[in-house]
C-alpha cells in the first residue's frame, strides 16, 4: 500500500452538443395484441417513437394481450409490436389525445427469419452438444467467441467450413476490442489450436446445408417482467464521421433485421448512471474529439457532451463510473495518464485528480465504486486505487499474483464494501484481490475452477493448456470462471461477482471470504452486478439482451428482456428514491443507446387502464 496526494486539474473544458426534442402535453397510448387467429398474446413487446424524436418507449402486453404506455408527449408516433417467431407489426398513432393501436401478429413462415430475431443466449443454447467433442467446441464458442461480442451477431450468418475458418483466422489475431493485432502479438493460442475442428463444428451448425441446431423459444415476459416500461435514449452519431443522419439502418429496434454491427459511428456508451434528479450520465471509451462523458435529459432526450482534453487533440477516454451517496458522479479518465474525474450534476463542474507519476494509474477495464468510509475505488492494471476525496490522496493496492505462465492478471472489475475495503477481479486468473482499507494489506480469493467443463478436456488438450498463455480477457481456459465486474451490498457484508465464463454469480462473504456460486439458468453469462436496497443482485447479460435479478431469500431469478436486439449492455446501475419506482439504467454498447427500465406496480397499470378507457 502506498499513499500520495493527487494532482488536481481544474482547467477542464465542457464542450456540449445539444440534441433536443420539443415538449408537448401528454397523452396515453394503449391497445391489444392478438395472433392471426384472434387469440390474445401476452408478453409482446410494443414500442413507440415520435417522428424525428430520440426516445423510444416500450412496454409489454399482459395475459389478456393488452398494453398501456405511460403518458407520452403529444405528437405523431411510429408504433410497432414484436415477439419471437412472429413478423414485426407496424402502425402509427397521433397522440394529440389518448389513442389506441391494436395489432395482429402473423407468424414467421421462414425458420431462418426467426433465427435472425434471436438474442445471443438462445442462439448459444441451440448449438449442438451431443458428444464430448461438440461440448468442447460449444464451450469455446460460449467463451472465446463471445469475448467481445454477442453470439447472435456472427451466428446470424451462414458460412461453409472454409468461411468459418477464415473468420477464425481473423479473430485469432484480434484483441478484446476487436482491433487487428496480428503484427503485434502471436495469434490466440486457443483459436489457433482448435481452428480446424471449430470451423467444422460451426459449419455443421451454421453452414449452407441442413443445420444441427435446435432452437427452443423461451416463454414471453409475464407478471412483473411484463409490467416494466423502458425508455431508450439514442446517442447521436459522431459529427466528425461526416455521415448522413439516416446512416444507421439497423439499431436493433426491429428484431427482424437481426443483430446490428457494433460499427455504428457514435459515442462509445459503456457505463451509465441516473443522477439524483433522474437524468443520465454515461462514459465514452471510444476515441473521439468531442466527449469524455455525456449527459442525457431524460424528459426531452437532449444530449450534452463534456470533453476533458486528451492527447493529440482527442477527448480523454473513460470507461467506469459510479454515483456516490451524495449524488456526485465519479469516473476514471485518461488524459495521457489514468486518473479520476469528479462531476457535480448540479453545477456540471468537472475536476480531474491524477495519481503521482511514480504510482500506478487507473487502467485496465476500469470500474469505479465507493466504500462506506467515503472513499472512491477504481481499477488499476496491477491492482486497485483508493482515493480519499477529503484529503485528496491516492492509495495504491498491488495484486499479490500478477504474471503467471497462463496469463497476466490485469484488473477488470472493482468494488468496495461498507467497511472501507476494496476488491478487484483478475479475470484471466480467476482471482479476486482484496485491499484492507484499515491496514493497507492485500490478500486474494481464488475461485474454484469449473469442473464440469474442465472434465471435457482431453489429455492432449490438457498438455496444450498447461503452457497456454492467455493474451487477453477473451481467450479463457475451458474451466475458467471469468470474474468480470462486481458489486457489493452496501447494507450487508456480501460481494457479488459476475463470473462470465462460469455463468454464475460468486457470492463472497466480505468478512470470512467464503465463496458460494449461484448459477444463472441456462448458462446465461453475467457481466456486472448491482445490489438494491432489498439485497437483491441485478446483473446485465451482455450476450442475452436482458437484465436479471436474483432474490437470495427465495433463491429465485427474474428476467427482464430488453426491447433492443444486440443491445450488449456492459453495466447496470440503480436509482432508488423514496416514494418512486425503482429505475434501472442500462447502457447499450453495441446499439449506442442508454436505457432506463422502470418497475411498475399492478396498481399503476390499472390506473392507466382506467384513464385510457375515458
Describe each region flagged by the PLM.
Residues 274, 282-287, 329-336, 376-382, ...:
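Conserved beta-strand positions in repeat-built beta-propeller and related beta-rich domains
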Residues 51-66:
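Short, acidic Ser/Thr/Gly-rich low-complexity loop/linker segments typical of extracellular
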Residues 84-101, 106:
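Structured interaction patches on ligand/partner-binding surfaces of diverse proteins
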Residues 141-152, 198:
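The canonical Cys-X-X-Cys-His
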Residues 563-614:
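Blade-level signature of beta-propeller repeat domains, shared across WD40, Kelch, NHL, RCC1
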Residues 242, 263-276, 311-325, 358-373, ...:
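Beta-rich, blade/repeat-based domains predominating
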Residues 52-54, 76, 80-92:
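A short, solvent-exposed loop/turn motif at the edges and junctions
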Residues 30-41:
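Structural motif
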Amino acid at each position: 500500500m502506498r499513499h500520495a496526494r493527487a494532482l488536481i486539474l481544474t482547467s477542464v473544458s465542457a464542450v456540449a452538443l445539444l440534441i433536443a426534442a420539443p415538449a408537448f402535453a401528454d397523452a396515453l397510448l394503449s391497445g391489444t395484441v392478438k395472433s392471426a387467429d384472434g387469440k390474445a398474446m401476452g408478453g409482446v413487446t410494443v414500442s413507440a417513437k415520435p417522428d424525428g424524436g430520440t426516445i423510444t418507449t416500450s412496454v409489454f402486453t399482459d395475459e389478456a394481450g393488452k398494453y398501456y404506455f405511460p403518458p407520452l408527449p403529444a405528437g405523431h408516433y411510429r408504433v410497432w409490436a414484436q415477439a419471437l417467431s412472429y413478423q414485426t407489426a407496424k402502425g402509427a398513432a397521433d397522440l394529440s389525445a389518448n389513442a389506441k393501436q391494436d395489432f395482429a401478429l402473423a407468424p414467421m413462415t421462414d425458420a431462418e427469419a426467426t433465427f435472425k430475431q434471436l438474442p445471443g443466449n438462445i442462439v448459444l443454447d441451440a448449438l449442438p452438444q451431443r458428444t464430448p467433442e461438440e461440448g468442447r467446441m460449444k464451450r469455446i464458442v460460449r467463451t472465446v467467441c463471445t469475448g467481445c461480442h454477442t453470439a447472435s451477431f456472427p451466428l446470424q450468418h451462414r458460412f461453409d467450413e472454409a468461411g468459418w475458418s477464415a473468420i477464425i483466422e481473423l479473430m485469432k489475431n484480434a484483441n478484446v476490442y476487436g482491433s487487428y493485432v496480428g503484427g503485434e502479438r502471436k495469434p490466440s493460442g486457443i483459436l489457433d489450436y482448435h481452428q480446424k475442428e471449430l470451423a467444422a463444428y460451426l459449419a455443421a451448425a451454421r453452414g449452407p446445408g441442413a443445420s444441427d441446431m435446435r432452437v427452443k423459444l423461451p416463454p414471453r415476459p409475464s407478471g412483473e417482467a411484463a409490467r416494466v416500461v423502458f425508455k431508450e435514449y439514442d446517442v447521436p452519431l459522431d459529427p466528425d464521421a461526416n455521415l448522413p443522419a439516416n446512416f444507421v439502418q439497423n439499431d436493433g429496434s426491429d428484431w427482424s433485421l437481426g443483430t446490428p454491427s457494433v460499427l455504428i459511428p457514435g459515442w462509445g456508451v459503456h457505463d451509465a448512471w441516473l443522477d439524483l434528479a433522474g437524468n443520465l450520465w454515461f462514459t465514452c471509451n471510444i476515441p473521439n474529439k468531442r466527449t469524455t462523458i455525456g449527459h442525457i435529459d431524460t424528459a426531452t432526450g437532449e444530449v450534452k457532451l463534456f470533453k476533458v482534453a486528451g492527447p493529440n487533440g482527442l477527448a480523454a477516454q473513460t470507461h467506469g463510473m459510479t454515483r456516490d451517496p451524495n449524488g456526485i458522479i465519479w469516473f476514471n479518465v485518461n488524459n495521457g495518464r489514468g486518473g479520476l474525474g469528479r462531476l457535480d450534476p448540479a453545477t456540471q463542474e468537472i475536476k480531474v485528480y491524477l495519481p503521482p507519476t511514480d504510482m500506478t494509474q487507473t487502467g485496465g477495464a476500469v470500474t469505479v465504486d465507493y466504500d462506506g468510509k467515503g472513499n472512491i475505488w477504481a481499477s488499476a492494471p496491477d491492482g486497485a486505487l483508493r482515493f480519499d476525496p477529503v484529503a485528496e490522496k491516492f492509495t495504491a493496492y498491488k495484486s499479490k499474483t500478477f504474471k503467471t505462465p497462463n496469463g497476466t492478471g490485469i484488473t477488470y472489475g472493482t468494488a468496495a464494501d461498507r467497511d472501507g475495503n476494496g476488491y478487484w477481479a483478475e479475470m484471466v486468473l480467476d482471482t479476486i484481490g482484496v485491499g484492507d482499507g484499515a491496514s493497507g494489506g492485500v490478500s486474494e480469493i481464488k475461485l474454484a475452477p469449473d469442473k464440469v467443463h474442465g472434465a471435457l478436456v482431453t489429455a492432449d488438450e490438457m498438455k496444450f493448456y498447461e503452457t497456454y498463455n492467455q493474451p487477453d480477457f477473451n481467450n479463457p481456459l475451458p474451466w475458467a470462471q471469468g470474474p468480470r465486474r462486481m458489486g457489493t451490498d452496501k447494507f450487508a457484508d456480501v460481494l457479488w461477482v459476475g463470473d462470465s465464463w462460469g455463468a454464475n454469480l460468486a457470492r463472497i462473504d466480505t468478512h470470512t471470504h467464503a465463496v458460494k456460486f449461484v448459477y444463472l439458468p441456462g448458462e446465461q453469462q453475467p457481466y456486472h452486478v448491482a445490489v438494491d436496497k432489498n439485497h437483491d443482485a441485478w446483473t446485465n447479460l451482455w450476450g442475452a439482451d436482458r437484465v436479471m435479478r436474483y432474490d437470495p431469500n427465495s433463491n429465485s431469478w427474474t428476467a427482464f428482456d430488453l426491447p433492443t436486439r444486440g443491445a450488449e449492455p456492459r453495466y447496470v446501475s440503480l436509482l432508488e428514491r423514496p416514494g418512486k419506482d425503482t429505475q434501472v439504467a442500462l447502457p447499450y454498447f453495441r446499439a449506442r443507446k442508454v436505457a432506463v427500465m422502470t418497475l411498475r406496480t399492478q396498481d399503476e397499470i390499472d390506473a392507466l387502464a382506467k384513464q385510457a378507457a375515458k
